[in-house]
């Protein structure tokens, strides 16, 4: 999108941290906001959307808005009964702050695309893997190569990323070419898409459990 190859994208926001380090704080992070409505307040009432748009504009992109996904879970080939049990484990993580936290507790972290996680677990290249929620991870076969799932504190599925956020981002030139009415329509539809996507993911996760 930045280079104009695509006009728009619907990514997981955390992966923008490679070119926009502050994007780490535009999605769920360790000890950050824990519920979808808290992120809505951040974006739409406390200036978060303006911050995101300023950061993305500097890279030639327009941040339309956040899209709620769901919590991440961690799959493991070995039992993890305390934070100390991550020490020495080879662990797939998305990088950035998340990886730094687990590195501090002794894990050997690596970044892998989703398509490479199953074979890495199967071959024993990694012991532990974070990806997304139960539905997607089940579909990718993680339950076939791991025996344990690491979850968060009571009431929260995820240990560190209870609200994984996606977004709608449009190249600045493509956004500028839209009429004011179409821009408003896209912004409104992003709200609707966020609600519908989040509900669909929660349903799929419940069925996967």
PLM features: what roles do these ranges have?
Residues 2-39, 47-209:
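N-terminal secretory/targeting leader peptides
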